[in-house]
Amino acid sequence: MKYRKFQLLMSKYGFSLLIMLLELSLVFGLFLYLGRMAPILWIIVLIFMSMATIVAIVNRSMAPESKVMWLVVTFVPIIGPLLYLMFGERRLSTKEIKQLNRLSSMHFREDNSKALRQKLKEDDKAAYGVIKSLLSMDSNADVYDRTDSQFFSSGESMWQHMLEDLKKAEKFIFLEYYIVEEGLMWNSILDILEQKAAQGVEVKMLYDDIGCMATLPGDYTIQLRSRGIEAHKFNKVIPRLTVAYNNRDHRKILVIDGQVAYTGGINLADEYINHIERFGYWKDSGIRLDGPGVKALTRLFLMTWYINRWEISDFDQYHLENQPCSGQGLCIPYGSGPKPIFRTQVGKKVYQSLINQATDSVYITTPYLIIDYDLTESIKNAAMRGVDVRIVTPFIPDKKLIQLITRGAYPDLLSAGVRIFEYSPGFIHSKQILVDKDFAAVGTINLDYRSLLHHYENAVLLYKTESIAEIQKDFQEIFSASQEIFPHTIKNSWYQKLVKEIAQLFAPIL
């Protein structure tokens, strides 16, 4: 581990960090120099910067918690306005806007989507409202039927099915992942990808540069291309201070021939299949789609693939005729991401919509629980109107500070009647919700600010599919393996409380 950290420090990432620190130091130094040479001018510049930043923050559409914290930060002389300028707001260039508009015009629309929505409106108005809300937030989402959905309650079971489906690929394979690490899981997949590329199958791979900076060598895209795999890093790290570094590609998508797709919480590394142990048993989940619903994940991948590249291939070549399946119910794969790429917080709004219309039960698993006032109130209100609301978080954390903040959310929720559990065997990384045994969502979205505000994410909303019974079974097994938290069991020292309060305060802007 120490050798890996040394390698990371001496790599391009360490160099980029050094350059960015130098840039920041240079700007800060110039301000100090100006303060010595022309103090009156310096004061005028400081006042102007602070006022301009405050006006920009007040007029910007953002979460109230984020707005308040940025206003607080702005009052720190020199540093505050500079931090907001560099990390507070991302603006798209004219070139990026044109590219985004071109990509948005390329649709894989489901032919009978309108009929499906109309039938749902007649049969179940509450369910129609949830789905209509999602479609209005994400113009790329659509409603699909005749799609089989298979739920996996562990990384190990999903991995084996992924290998079998990869071996059957004939036309193309798309992979988009946050973390990839050499080992049993990834190497077994890579061997098949190399074989398929040699057979003429088109293989595209996208992985997050920061997500993989400690797991893959800097030249790994070159290594993959030498094996016939077209590979790129998402949001590549370069020696420049920019707010875009906060926007990571946290998605996990595998698409095979436009017919089969996988997504969920499972990255391509050995801890996700429990081949190695990091934090006890690694509990994760995922879902496999087979049929027309795969179109949405195919398009979502292509949107991300081309968003930072100025050429666009014809999407129609990947718009293959899906073989309809016998799957019951509806599925709506969707994406979420940061502004201004996405108009609203899709991941958060879907959860709120589901929770607000719940009448019987709401079950949630999340590795982190750091949520804003709106979502907290939705959860509390559901519990107070008699809905059985249960949230499961890890007993063994991957980040102790994050667990401290997560546990800080417990008292408020418990007081409203929400039941909270911690998964005893280890670290629960599953990101799923089950509502009234009719709706479920499985994907990559954590209940924290980074996932809900800053990262590119994806999930699949399910309505009355066969897989919902398996999700319900998984929840019951999780509850049985977890310890319930009660108000009298929460004990923190004054030091822990102080750290928790400070961390919670700044969470919205981190």
Predicted segments, located by residue:
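Charged, low-complexity intrinsically disordered terminal segments
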Residues: 2-23, 27-40, 114-510
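Transmembrane alpha-helices and immediately adjacent membrane-cytoplasm interface residues
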Residues: 45-116
